[in-house]
Amino acid sequence: MMTGRQGRATFQFLPDEARSLPPPKLTDPRLAFVGFLGYCSGLIDNAIRRRPVLLAGLHRQLLYITSFVFVGYYLLKRQDYMYAVRDHDMFSYIKSHPEDFPEKDKKTYGEVFEEFHPVR
């Protein structure tokens, strides 16, 4: 039976190692987008229940926005953690297998670009 990566706890949304990562910024555009989705879901809820779409239930729309941003914040935190785990595994593999990843010789910009001749 496949158990996945060693040391990985199953069915755990945010492990304790995720606390060492910096939290997502509250000004992240992805959070604003998720909040906008919450606002739109409040509008759709009003439209389905045949209420005035923009004016009815402003408190409900605010509740949708805050709950969507709250859930989105933890989803972003999980996404950042998963990317950090992937990067850690990838860099440790590169470090332990240097023969598969040879150092490339560094070129200067003069070697990369062609010589410039202005046309007048």
From Swiss-Prot:
Pfam families: NDUF_C2 (PF06374). There is a minor unacetylated form of subunit B14.5b. One of its GO terms (biological process) is mitochondrial electron transport, NADH to ubiquinone. Its main location: mitochondrion. One of its GO terms (cellular component) is respiratory chain complex I. The keyword Magnesium does not apply. It is found in: Mitochondrion inner membrane. Keywords: Acetylation, Electron transport, Membrane, Mitochondrion, Mitochondrion inner membrane, Respiratory chain, Transmembrane, Transmembrane helix, Transport. The chain crosses the membrane at residues 57-76. The modification N-acetylmethionine is found at residue 1. It is a single-pass membrane protein. Accessory subunit of the mitochondrial membrane respiratory chain NADH dehydrogenase (Complex I), that is believed not to be involved in catalysis but required for the complex assembly. Complex I functions in the transfer of electrons from NADH to the respiratory chain. The immediate electron acceptor for the enzyme is believed to be ubiquinone. Belongs to the complex I NDUFC2 subunit family. Complex I is composed of 45 different subunits. Interacts with TMEM242. This is NADH dehydrogenase [ubiquinone] 1 subunit C2. The gene is NDUFC2.
